[in-house]
UniProtKB/Swiss-Prot annotation:
<dbReference type="Pfam" id="PF01885">
    <property type="entry name" value="PTS_2-RNA"/>
</dbReference>
<comment type="similarity">
    <text>Belongs to the KptA/TPT1 family.</text>
</comment>
<dbReference type="GO" id="GO:0003950">
    <property type="term" value="F:NAD+ poly-ADP-ribosyltransferase activity"/>
</dbReference>
<protein>
    <recommendedName>
        <fullName>Probable RNA 2'-phosphotransferase</fullName>
        <ecNumber>2.7.1.-</ecNumber>
    </recommendedName>
</protein>
<dbReference type="GO" id="GO:0000215">
    <property type="term" value="F:tRNA 2'-phosphotransferase activity"/>
</dbReference>
<dbReference type="GO" id="GO:0006388">
    <property type="term" value="P:tRNA splicing, via endonucleolytic cleavage and ligation"/>
</dbReference>
<dbReference type="InterPro" id="IPR002745">
    <property type="entry name" value="Ptrans_KptA/Tpt1"/>
</dbReference>
<dbReference type="InterPro" id="IPR042081">
    <property type="entry name" value="RNA_2'-PTrans_C"/>
</dbReference>
<comment type="function">
    <text>Removes the 2'-phosphate from RNA via an intermediate in which the phosphate is ADP-ribosylated by NAD followed by a presumed transesterification to release the RNA and generate ADP-ribose 1''-2''-cyclic phosphate (APPR&gt;P). May function as an ADP-ribosylase.</text>
</comment>
<keyword id="KW-0808">Transferase</keyword>
<dbReference type="InterPro" id="IPR042080">
    <property type="entry name" value="RNA_2'-PTrans_N"/>
</dbReference>
<keyword id="KW-0520">NAD</keyword>
<dbReference type="InterPro" id="IPR022928">
    <property type="entry name" value="RNA_2'-PTrans_KptA"/>
</dbReference>
Length: 207
């Protein structure tokens, strides 16, 4: 459920995390899920099939996108898109002026115009079965356009636990990689994107 606090804006759940007030009802769980799936799919995977034009950096026209969603969901209002984006704790989407895009997770071919990460190390969580292959060959994107790395050990472990019960965390020597010309783009406070990570920059963090 998405609600709106007059002081702190849109939030998910029953009360504002900052002031604990209930706020104004905006969107129920069912509609939030439907919109979320469509927004994610369109901005990351199938913009053309959904009927929206995407530029080289992943931006689409917000008003045109809303029109497409209104045709699909007759209850759709532009406020719902703002509510979905602004209440998303993972920061998956970005609105700038009258444009909207996904920050990460793309399978479509887009270019990254984010700033370079200044973290000396970034992290990648893997299953025990993957580790030897990664240390030998490096990390390459599989279903997504870019390799997704985490800015902290904890975040890497959190992501890896979705896929394996016993994650192994690899540390990436980001400083040395960038010195050697590998671009590491900061998509959010927690996610760094790269074309690939060669094996010479990878180290297993021993528990």
């Amino acid at each position: 459920m998405i609600r709106k606090c007059t002081e702190h804006g849109y939030f998910r759940g029953g009360s504002c995390q900052q002031c604990k007030r209930p706020g104004r009802y905006v969107l129920d769980d069912s509609r939030e899920e439907k919109l979320g799936r469509f927004v994610s799919g369109t901005l990351r995977h199938f913009p053309a099939s959904a009927g929206v034009k995407m530029d080289e950096y992943g931006w689409v026209d917000l008003n045109a996108f809303c029109d497409v969603m209104k045709k699909r969901y007759n209850w759709m209002r532009k406020e719902y898109l703002y509510a979905l984006v602004e209440s998303d704790e993972k920061g998956r989407y970005q609105i700038r002026g009258f444009m909207i895009r996904a920050r990460y997770g793309h399978s479509v071919n887009i270019e990254l115009d984010y700033e370079e990460s200044d973290a000396p190390y970034v992290y990648y969580g893997a299953s025990p079965e993957e580790v030897d292959v990664l240390l030998e060959n490096g990390i390459f994107p599989i279903k997504q356009r870019y390799v997704h790395l985490s800015t902290s050990y904890e975040k890497a472990a959190e992501v890896a636990l979705i896929h394996t019960e016993s994650p192994v965390i690899l540390q990436v020597d980001a400083f040395r990689a960038q010195e050697d010309g590998i671009s590491l783009k900061l998509a959010t406070d927690y996610i760094v994107l790269a074309e690939k990570i060669p094996p010479e920059y990878l180290y297993v963090i021993e528990e």
